[in-house]
């Protein structure tokens, strides 16, 4: 069975060792203290539980990166044209640029006691899936 929750990732209202999986998609970079959130993820996972995180990342191919930077600069303009506001789209681009690289995020996950860490780039590294286990 799957149950969906929406809570403060830095202070989860769950018991220790309660979940088999902890997933988060495009949310980790919006959390004030990512380190605290990962600590909470570890706390609520059962031993043998798995963390899966899908998040924007750093493009590894230089040619693709140049196109992605140009595309990223147009997103706020398109947002302003379509919905009349550019600020949410500027926030999106800034939060992506300021977030951890794949390896930096992997190290932060490791710092929070996770093991068997890995990440997989998708779309040339525009996004990455990080995976880790609580052993």
Which residue stretches match the model-derived regions?
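A short SAM/SAH-binding and catalytic strip from SAM-dependent methyltransferases
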Residues: 20-34, 57
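Core SAM-dependent methyltransferase catalytic element
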Residues: 106, 110-135
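C-terminal alpha-helical "lid/dimerization" subdomain adjacent to the S-adenosyl-L-methionine
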Residues: 58-108, 112, 118
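A short glycine-rich, Lys/Arg-flanked "PGG" loop and its adjoining helix->strand segment in the class I
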Residues: 35-50
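A short acidic, Gly/Pro-enriched loop at the edge of an enzyme's catalytic core
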Residues: 7-22
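Short conserved AdoMet
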Residues: 32, 46, 134
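Short loop/edge segments at beta-strand edges and connector loops
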Residues: 6-7, 121
